[in-house]
Regions:
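Conserved "HGTGT" condensation-loop signature of ketosynthase/thiolase-family condensing enzymes
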Residues: 1-73, 97
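Conserved catalytic cysteine-centered active-site region
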Residues: 34-36, 40-52, 79-133
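Contiguous hydrophobic segments
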Residues: 15, 59, 67, 122-127, ...
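Short glycine-rich or small-residue beta-strand-to-loop segments that form or flank ligand, phosphate
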Residues: 73-79
Length: 136
């Protein structure tokens, strides 16, 4: 059995910070930042929590996939900025989505987080342990 991506979703905080907003703090300018990072602007959390943002992205992905939350067997959240140590962000997402049939856990692997979580989900699917995974 092989898995495939059936829906995607995203969420970004409303607070946008451009490079020029940072030039005094970092004693640099927009051009220097762009040349080295490619970043023009970033979305910064103010009142949002990691689990809040994960839930908003998940809701969009679930809607895009055209499935119900009850169909989800596995939730994996990759983050280095959890709301709390316990419960895991994935457990908070599971509760908020009412995805009562899902096993869930977080992984903490920074930049390679999505591909690592995707590979774990794919392994669970290939082994026949789950049918539908939510990777955040």
């Amino acid at each position: 059995m092989f898995g495939k991506i059936i829906g995607t979703g995203s969420y970004a905080p409303d607070n946008v910070v451009c490079n020029n907003d940072l030039k005094e703090f970092f004693e640099t300018d927009d051009q220097w930042i762009r040349e080295r990072t490619g970043i023009k602007r970033r979305h910064i959390m103010t009142d949002e929590s990691t689990s809040y943002m994960a839930c908003r992205a998940a809701e969009k992905a679930i809607e895009n996939a055209g499935i119900s939350c009850e169909k989800i067997d596995l939730i994996i959240v990759s983050t280095v900025s959890s709301d709390t140590v316990l419960p895991s962000t994935a457990c908070i997402v599971q509760d908020q989505l009412k995805a009562t049939n899902a096993m869930c856990f977080d992984i903490n692997v920074a930049c390679t987080g999505f591909i690592t979580a995707y590979n774990i989900a794919q392994s669970y699917i290939n082994a026949g342990l789950v049918e539908t995974a939510l990777v955040i």
